[in-house]
Regions:
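Alpha-helical segment proximal to the catalytic Tyr-Lys
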Residues: 23, 65-66
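Catalytic Tyr-X3-Lys loop
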Residues: 1-15, 56
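Conserved mid-core segment of classical short-chain dehydrogenase/reductases
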Residues: 1-4, 23, 45
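Catalytic loop of short-chain dehydrogenase/reductase
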Residues: 28-65, 76-80, 86-89
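Rossmann-fold scaffold of SDR-type NAD(P)-dependent oxidoreductases
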Residues: 10, 33, 73
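C-terminal helical subdomain
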Residues: 74-75, 82, 93-145
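Conserved internal alpha-helix within the Rossmann fold of NAD(P)-dependent oxidoreductases
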Residues: 10-18, 30, 40, 124
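Hydrophobic positions on the long internal alpha-helix
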Residues: 13-21, 25, 59-60
Length: 145
């Protein structure tokens, strides 16, 4: 049930929105979907989340071929200080044994390596023009721009 919920939120909800935008009478020049590094490199404990983001990445690759007038990017914002990160960094809730890569997040918490959601949003907005320079349907990471 948890796997289905993760897929519904991270993949299918995006598909519903994309289909509505792309099949309506709206000209959409650019679509940016928020992805994650775990969608391209797997790690113990991240199964459903990784698979849901991988599916989202591939959906954008497919749509880039099907809708050539729209530019698609799967964008990983990097570590962002959100409620999800707070939950994952809580040692009483999430074990490093279950999620070995979680220590990297815990080390980044409250540092410049994990900006606030507002700071991350500003960085994404500033990156929008540069995203048009990479091939449509590509995955990219904010930290590599």
């Amino acid at each position: 049930e948890q796997f289905t919920q993760v897929m519904n939120i991270n993949t299918w909800a995006n598909k519903v929105i994309l289909d509505w935008l792309l099949t309506g009478n709206i000209q959409v020049k650019q679509i940016i979907a928020i992805s994650t590094g775990t969608g391209v490199s797997t790690s113990k404990g991240w199964g459903a989340y990784s698979l849901s983001k991988l599916a989202l990445n591939k959906l954008l690759t497919l749509y880039a071929d099907e809708f050539p007038d729209t530019h698609f990017t799967a964008l990983a914002p990097g570590l962002v200080d959100t409620a999800m990160q707070a939950y994952l960094c809580d040692e009483n809730r999430v074990s490093v044994d279950d999620f070995p890569s979680i220590q990297k997040m815990r080390d980044a918490k409250e540092t410049n390596n994990m900006p606030s959601a507002q700071d991350a949003a500003h960085a994404i907005i500033n990156a929008v023009p540069r995203l048009m320079e990479i091939p449509s349907g590509s995955y990219t990471d904010m930290r590599n721009l």
